[in-house]
């Protein structure tokens, strides 16, 4: 639960960086 939740947050932030980058 914790890992997946954290991974989800990180994934969204990462995708945001990729889109902007």
Swiss-Prot record:
Q: In its keyword annotation, does this UniProt entry include Secreted?
A: yes
- The keyword Secreted belongs to this UniProt entry's keyword annotation: yes
Which locations, inside or outside the cell, does it occupy? Secreted
Tissue-specific expression: Expressed by the skin glands.
**Looking at the record's lineage, which domain of life comes first?**
Eukaryota
Q: What is its main location?
A: secreted
What GO cellular-component annotations does this UniProt entry give?
Answer: extracellular region
General function of this protein:
Has no antimicrobial activity against tested bacteria.
**What name has this protein been given in UniProt?**
Magainin-B1
């Amino acid at each position: 639960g914790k890992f997946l939740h954290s991974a989800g947050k990180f994934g969204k932030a990462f995708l945001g960086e990729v889109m902007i980058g």
